From Swiss-Prot:
Species in which this protein is naturally found: Schizosaccharomyces pombe (strain 972 / ATCC 24843) (Fission yeast)
Alphabetical list of InterPro entries matching this protein: ARM-like, ARM-type_fold, CND3, Cnd3_C
Stated name of the protein: Condensin complex subunit 3
Top-level taxonomic group: Eukaryota
Gene assigned in the entry: cnd3
Biological process (GO), any one: cell division
Protein family membership: Belongs to the CND3 (condensin subunit 3) family.
Length: 875
């Protein structure tokens, strides 16, 4: 067999490639051997992607090159092949460029050494091909170029830099995946690789967890921040395959790196600062390794030597057992009496400043366990209640523990009234501890009030007007004056009491008028705090007042001016509190209650939405408006256009929170109700013209999103086929909702065209007509109305280019065809109805003329006549 015949035989099957390699190897010394190899490659170059025969031939040739290098290294066939194929990298035919890159990628992989000149030529050519306009060419060029990577820390590494650029910016997900799999992992490339865990393509995200991260080896090479971020992204991914890949990586590879010790793995995640991710990681771990759950044991010594990691593991184990209904495994959890003892042990540990944070974290996990207990043990319930009450009264706990203590306290109390009574006693005791008797006498009023439900006439509480000074280094601290210390203690005590009050109102639902304790709290603590000159106290007081306002509509109405004033004159924190409170009050009590303040509330929401210098406040304003529109339809016509503009506004491109809020809001709003979709269509043109004006003044480098993409997104919101309820029933028929929304949109476009600037903007608005979905079964009057608007626009005599004229002519023909078809249908339908009416009328007349009186009716008439005659005779 000749060389060409052997190569031709390789296209039938891969199974015989080894034998064919041996046969071809015997011909290596023949004259023209190299030429035959190149001829075979030339044939492959013109074969399009997907041809299995060409792929098998190429695979055979690569196998032979590798085989030849092993058997006879003196024969160099690689250099001639590469030099020959390099000539085709600049070909006009995309198939040739694709095959050339593919051959280079396969052949270079077989080479251990390469000539410097050839290396530089290859690199130069491939650097241009990775930017090819065809994605299939870029894909193979990336594979080929990755073989030329140099393991250097030089920032001027051209190959690495271009691969990183493609990894971040290439529009093709397959090209990005190719870079991801082929780029070398190093300190300089690792951040870009991990970034692909947030890729828009699910296959790429899965690739990070299933193929790239295992190549790194021990996860401890990653920083704690990177470990937590990787787990958070993967385990929360919306795609099930990505989530499973991340869970498998955790449950098999990472646990193996931690010597199959779950506690050691948790130690590497810094659970004290990343408890949410750690809890999720444990749950996913046991989802994959279900058998390991029953193997966990919690002996007495475990509870006596709790750490942050072990306490979190116990809490998560308890939650899993409850969620999965593993009642037999729940027996491993301690009883309420034992749990109380373990909590009290950690209270003692709080005295040690070195372990304070860890002890707080452990107490938090034990309280979570307590929240899930059934509390049927009355002795245990009382002990735990006493322990929590004592800790709240005597210890300065962080806010996170205060909220959990009070939440558990609410569960332990039999009724809401008992809960309020108990917590009022605790607050009274805490308040008295922070105010000395001497201070009370000097002030001459009841500064430490007895919070009694029979006493509402107490004076306002006053606190020091001195704000705590900024912290200083230890060597610069001076001994504070006694008066200053008293002021600090009072302010701190006030904040502590207000934290208790805030948690109290967060855990009750009864009306303000039904609970006298709440009225007491309002008068003696909250109102004085709102009037305080200490900013932290005033902020906390306003938060507490907002919770009270949610329980009483009249109180909410009375305090609207206060929160409006807070927004106008207050700090950023107060502005955020004001927006949240006003929004919650509108949602809770209804917009009808606050009609008087509609303009004022709308004004501050507008102002917040335009706060470009404060991203948090701007996001909060957008979120508040979005809630009001979805839930209450609060002044849709006023807020909808500004929201759309802010969503696409170039200045908000870095405000990711705002984009996320609005990105969720618009589909929910548009597809949730057909009325909302109609509103979007109504303001479509006004919003788009405003955006055109904004984008007109931008430089090309500042444009993040083209106006065409913006219009396409807005058109998608007006697609009636995506409505949650697409049809409504009227009688026995179903009518499609918003069936004519795009015809309505066409009317709005014609009305807005005179307002658009001549040239590109007007041409762009006209081009939208070709993207509308106009149904053919609307009433003919609808088409006539749109046609009249088109004729009105044409009568203005605006100058238009040929493309715009063509679009308008095509749209007009479509309207005429639909109108004529529907007119004929309506005439036919009208004639049919008239015929049916005439037939029914004729049938009714025949029935009346041929009607016969029944015998029973005649008999009744005769009886009535006889009775009448008899009555006359009697008279």
């Amino acid at each position: 067999m000749s060389c060409i015949q052997i190569i031709s035989s390789s296209q039938t099957s891969i199974a015989g490639h080894r034998k064919l390699c041996n046969k071809l190897f015997t011909l290596r010394t023949q004259e023209g051997f190299e030429t035959d190899i190149l001829r075979a490659l030339n044939i492959i170059l013109t074969v399009k992607k997907g041809n299995s025969n060409a792929d098998r031939v190429l695979r055979f040739l690569v196998t032979f090159v590798n085989y030849l290098q092993q058997k006879d290294p003196e024969i160099d066939i690689v250099q001639p092949i590469l030099k020959h194929i390099l000539r085709g990298l600049d070909a006009k035919d995309k198939t040739v460029r694709y095959r050339c890159c593919q051959i280079i990628a396969r052949v270079v992989n077989c080479v251990k050494e390469i000539d410097d000149d050839l290396y530089n030529t290859l690199k130069e050519k491939l650097l241009s091909r990775v930017l090819d306009r065809e994605s299939i060419v870029r894909l193979e060029a990336v594979v080929a170029l990755s073989r030329l990577q140099e393991d250097t820390g030089d920032e001027e590494n051209d190959v690495r830099n271009i691969l990183l650029f493609l990894l971040q910016n290439d529009p093709s997900s397959e090209v990005r995946r190719s870079v991801l799999l082929n780029i070398e992992v190093s300190n300089s490339t690792l951040p870009f690789i991990l970034e692909r865990a947030r890729d828009v393509d699910a296959a790429n995200r899965k690739c990070v967890y299933a193929r790239v991260l295992p190549k790194i080896g021990d996860f401890r090479y990653l920083s704690i921040k990177k470990r937590v971020r990787i787990l958070k992204w993967g385990l929360n991914d919306r795609d099930e395959s990505v989530e499973k890949a991340a869970a498998d990586m955790l449950a098999y590879q990472w646990i193996e790196n931690a010597d199959n010790n779950l506690l050691e793995l948790l130690e590497r995640l810094d659970v004290s600062n990343n408890s949410d991710v750690a809890v999720l990681a444990i749950k996913k771990f046991f989802d994959v390794r279900v058998d390991s759950l029953s193997q966990l044991e919690f002996p007495e010594q475990f509870w006596l030597e709790l750490t942050a990691e072990s306490s979190l593991l116990a809490r998560t184990f308890n939650e899993i057992c409850i969620e999965k209904n593993y009642t037999d495994l729940l027996d491993k959890m301690p009883e309420v009496v034992q749990l109380t003892y373990y909590i009290e042990r950690q209270y003692v540990s709080l005295r040690d400043k070195s372990s304070y944070d860890e002890s707080c974290f452990i107490i938090e996990q034990l309280l979570y366990i307590g929240l899930s207990q059934d509390m049927v043990d009355e002795i245990g319930r009382r002990k735990l209640l006493k322990s929590l009450t004592n800790s709240l009264s005597t210890m300065a706990l962080p806010d996170s523990l205060i909220s959990l203590h009070i939440e558990l306290l609410r569960k332990l109390c039999s009724s809401e009234n008992d809960f309020c009574s108990l917590l009022v006693e605790i607050i009274t005791e805490v308040f008295e501890q922070g105010h000395s008797q001497n201070q009370t006498e000097e002030q001459g009023n009841s500064n430490a009030p007895e919070l009694n439900k029979n006493d509402y006439e107490g004076e306002e509480i006053t606190v020091s007007q001195k704000s705590p000074s900024p912290s200083l280094p230890p060597n610069e601290l001076n001994e504070p004056e006694p008066d200053d210390m008293d002021g600090y203690k009072e302010a701190f005590n006030e904040l502590r009491c207000l934290s208790y009050v805030q948690c109290l109102f967060e855990n009750i639902t009864s009306s303000l008028n039904e609970n006298l304790y709440m009225v007491d709290m309002l008068k003696t603590l909250i109102i004085p705090a709102v009037r305080s000159h200490d900013l932290p106290i005033r902020e906390k007081g306003l938060e507490c007042l907002s919770l009270v306002c949610l329980l009483n509509a009249d109180l909410a109405f009375e305090n609207v001016p206060l929160y409006l004033h807070c927004y106008e004159k207050g700090s950023v924190v107060l502005k955020c509190t004001a927006i949240r409170t006003l929004t919650d009050m509108l949602i809770q009590h209804g917009k009808a209650k606050f009609t008087e303040y509609e303009d004022a509330i709308s004004s501050i929401l507008f102002e917040a939405l335009g706060e470009f210098e404060n991203a948090e406040l701007q996001t909060l304003g957008a979120e508040a408006i979005a809630k009001l529109l979805v839930i209450l339809h609060y002044r849709d016509e006023l807020f909808l256009k500004p929201l759309i503009i802010q969503y696409f506004e170039p200045n908000t491109v870095d405000n990711h929170a705002l984009r996320q809020v609005l990105g969720y809001f618009f589909p929910v709003y548009a597809f949730g109700a057909h009325e909302n979709q109609w509103r979007i269509a109504t303001i479509f043109c006004d919003a788009l013209l405003s955006l055109l004006e904004i984008y007109r003044d931008l430089d090309e480098d500042d444009v993040q999103l083209s106006i065409g993409h913006i219009a396409q997104q807005m058109l998608d919101w007006t697609d009636n086929e995506k409505l949650y309820e697409r049809k409504t029933q009227t009688g026995d028929d179903y009518i499609a909702l918003n069936h004519n929304v795009h015809l309505h949109l066409a009317n709005m476009i014609f009305e807005s065209l005179p307002n658009a600037s001549e040239g590109k903007e007007r041409k762009f608005m006209i081009s939208l007509l070709g993207k509308l979905k106009i149904p053919t079964d609307l009433p003919s009057s609808d088409y006539q109305r749109t046609k009249r608007k088109l004729e009105t626009y044409e009568s203005h005599g605006f100058t238009m280019d040929s493309t715009s004229l063509s679009i308008l002519a095509k749209f007009e023909r479509m309207l005429l065809q639909n109108e004529e078809a529907r007119s004929k249908f309506e005439e036919t339908e009208e004639e049919r109805l008239m015929e049916n009416a005439e037939e029914n009328e004729h049938a009714g007349a025949e029935a009346i003329s041929g009607e016969i009186i029944p015998d029973t009716v005649e008999a009744n008439m005769e009886d009535e006549e006889e009775v009448y005659v008899k009555q006359e005779e009697d008279l």
